[in-house]
């Protein structure tokens, strides 16, 4: 039997190179077009339906959270930009659902956008969590905390980015993007 190794004196270190790949100091702009999918993928719902229910409602209904199809495109304030995720695409590249527990009770929701396999990644990520932070008046403390954690030895942080989200709800017949405001994207 080998001797047990002690972790006393071992130091946890974050990988600083992960934070140097992208500039997270500004605001990214995302355009999300939502549409009704199909029953086999569980995306046969409207945008209104997925925003209507809380985690408690789903528990009472004994069903998984509703999802819709989504086409996620990254750009600037003028629209999607060539070379960025989803540019020029017409078919959905993601599924979208409300995320969070108690936050699912808020009027403005947090979203989980899951990019479909083979449809690309955004900053190396297929799961994009967008948090609204409705209970936090300034709405920047969460990002600030993660940014500060980067500089503390033996603490692991997550990459974060402010995101300005625009949503076009094709499930209601809309043909234009509505401004959903500022979100914080947190690495999953």
Where are these regions (language model features)?
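Phosphate-handling architecture centered on phosphoinositide signaling
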Residues: 2-188
């Amino acid at each position: 039997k080998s001797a047990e190794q002690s972790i006393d004196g071992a130091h946890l270190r974050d990988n600083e190179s992960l934070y140097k790949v992208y500039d997270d100091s500004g605001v990214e702009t995302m355009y999300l077009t939502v549409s009704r999918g199909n029953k086999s993928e569980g995306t046969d719902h409207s945008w209104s339906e997925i925003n209507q229910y809380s985690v408690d409602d789903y528990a009472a209904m004994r069903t998984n959270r509703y999802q819709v199809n989504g086409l996620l495109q990254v750009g600037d304030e003028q629209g999607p930009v060539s070379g960025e995720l989803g540019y020029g695409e017409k078919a959905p590249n993601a599924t979208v659902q409300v995320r969070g527990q108690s936050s699912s009770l808020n009027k403005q929701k947090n979203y989980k956008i899951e990019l479909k396999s083979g449809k690309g990644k955004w900053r190396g990520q297929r799961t994009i969590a967008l948090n609204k932070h409705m209970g936090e008046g300034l709405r920047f403390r969460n990002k600030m905390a993660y940014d500060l954690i980067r500089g503390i030895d033996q603490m692991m942080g997550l990459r974060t980015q402010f995101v300005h989200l625009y949503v076009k709800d094709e499930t209601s017949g809309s043909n234009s993007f509505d401004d959903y405001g500022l979100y914080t994207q947190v690495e999953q």
